[in-house]
Amino acid sequence: MATLKDQLIHNLLKEEQTPQNKITVVGVGAVGMACAISILMKDLADELALVDVIEDKLKGEMMDLQHGSLFLRTPKIVSGKDYNVTANSKLVIITAGARQQEGESRLNLVQRNVNIFKFIIPNVVKYSPNCKLLIVSNPVDILTYVAWKISGFPKNRVIGSGCNLDSARFRYLMGERLGVHPLSCHGWVLGEHGDSSVPVWSGMNVAGVSLKTLHPDLGTDKDKEQWKEVHKQVVESAYEVIKLKGYTSWAIGLSVADLAESIMKNLRRVHPVSTMIKGLYGIKDDVFLSVPCILGQNGISDLVKVTLTSEEEARLKKSADTLWGIQKELQF
């Protein structure tokens, strides 16, 4: 007896269903799900896989997204505790880890998250040996280093979300002051994601007009307009949002989808993301810090050599020394 499906549909070929543009998100907390929905809304994948250790939450999140399939263009959404669901991913985004508590520094989280990565990374590598790894868990610069060490991947394929969000926050606040959309406000925050990030005042511009040239005191203590406050707000904003709502999610999710778009579509846009910076700015250790990187289908293909003042360079070097001080103590 022919089934309804057989009566309705005449099959022409037996297809091998291998995804061409698969993305995996590891960790379905607030950040992971914000990344997932942002990626779905941008139509970046033909398959989305979710992985977590909390099975009920994982299944619930998957079902909730699947129920929105009519409004999306991602034909397959899967999940599982077992990493076989991640097989053949082009991009694997790691958001799993212990959550930053109110008032806790990102660096405090580190050994807790290293132990989690020792389980996650080998499993990802086993099923998607050619993927790009995008690390979002904090402290992101150290955990990107950890992922690079554990995975054995070349450095172009291990990317930290780094200062992409810090720079976005900076451009938003700059835009608020000037009454201009953030897309037209150019400014870069580099170095360590978080407390010791470095704003590059000399590069701030609107329509190619340098703000520092118009206002030489920009970013200094003697600045009457106190533009330094803008960077201070960038640093404090995550802590403030955590204090108010318990965690941050939407902005980091959108920021990660922005990076995913450059990778999946081979756009070769420039983003401030965390990469291995040894040999630059007098840094001699294996540390990952954010500098402007060209992102495409192979991950980070190139980086832009930013002209920094001696003070900015010194701050970058200090960040590197701090990170290395922590990294060399880590137990793998």
UniProtKB/Swiss-Prot annotation:
It catalyses: (S)-lactate + NAD(+) = pyruvate + NADH + H(+). The modification N-acetylalanine is found at A2. Its main location: cytoplasm. Keywords: Acetylation, Cytoplasm, Isopeptide bond, NAD, Oxidoreductase, Phosphoprotein, Ubl conjugation. It is an enzyme of class 1 (oxidoreductase). GO terms for molecular function: L-lactate dehydrogenase activity. There is a cross-link at K57 (Glycyl lysine isopeptide (Lys-Gly) (interchain with G-Cter in SUMO2)). One of its GO terms (biological process) is lactate metabolic process. Pfam families: Ldh_1_C, Ldh_1_N. This is L-lactate dehydrogenase A chain. It comes from Pan troglodytes (Chimpanzee).
